[in-house]
Structure formats: C-alpha cells, structure tokens
A protein has these predicted regions:
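Bacterial N-terminal signal peptides that target proteins for export
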Residues: 1-8
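Short, compositionally biased P/S/T/A/G/V-rich stretches that sit at domain boundaries
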Residues: 22-50
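Aromatic/hydrophobic beta-strand junction motif of beta-rich domains
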Residues: 52-61
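Extracellular Ig-like/FN3 beta-sandwich strand-entry sites
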Residues: 65, 104-106
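Conserved aromatic beta-strand anchor motif in extracellular beta-sandwich/beta-rich domains
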Residues: 70-74, 111
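Aromatic sugar-binding surface patches on proteins
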Residues: 87-96
C-alpha cells in the first residue's frame, strides 16, 4: 500500500510539472505590415517583384509570464529567431523578414513555447 501511495504521488507530481501551457495563439498570419499593433493586408503568398519583406503577426491569449519564439524556416534551415516575453493576458507580437530575390519557395514560421514545442505553424509562398 505504501508503494502505491508513493507511485500515485509521483504520478501526480509528474503530471503537474509537465502540464502543457494553458494559453494559446488566437491569431497567426502573414502581413505586409503592422499598424497600431494590428496587421494590414494579410497574405499567403508574395512575389519578389512586388515586396521584399513580410511580417508574421501573432496574438497570444493567456500566456503571460511565458516566452514565445518566432522561428523563420526556409529549406529546412532556421533563418531567423526572435523570442518575446509575454507580459499580458492578450499580447500581440510580430517579426519581419527581408527576403532576397533568390529565396523563392515555401517559408514557414513556427511559434514556439518556453520548451520550444510548436504552438502554431504557418507557411507562405515567396515567388
């Protein structure tokens, strides 16, 4: 019986310690810019002849006290990362990337939590 109680307490402790973050990414999108903390002109593809930079915007809910990272990927390679400290129940952050004309193809931005687990992932085409 004593071993069963120890096992139960250990299981509860492990579950509490490894619980997933309760917050979420309520919006995640690509845009050509951000004004007044809001995205303008959402896009899922851009042409190298029209724009050479793009922004990734996220609105985070109930993640105060945590960090999130925008991880920009191209051809399975990390091209840029930016980590943010979340300081409110509703928090909006964005990153921007200048793209070279030779970097055409699929780009992905992963939103990572404190443990670098993927909270959200979005892709766009650069043509």
């Amino acid at each position: 019986m004593r071993h069963l109680i120890k096992f139960a307490l250990l299981t509860i402790t492990f579950c509490i310690g490894s619980s997933a973050i309760a917050g979420s990414v309520s919006r995640a999108l690509f845009t050509i810019g951000v004004e007044n903390r809001e995205p303008v002109i959402m896009v899922d593809s851009i042409g190298s002849d029209s724009y050479n930079s793009i922004s990734f915007f996220t609105e985070l809910t109930d993640l105060s006290g945590h960090t999130v990272t925008h991880q920009w990927m191209y051809n399975d390679k990390v091209m840029f990362e930016k980590t943010f400290d979340v300081a409110g129940a509703r928090w909006r952050v964005w990153t921007s990337k200048t793209l070279l004309p030779s970097w055409t193809g699929t780009w992905t931005v992963n939103v990572l939590d404190d443990d670098r687990s993927v909270l959200e992932s979005k892709s766009f085409e650069y043509q």
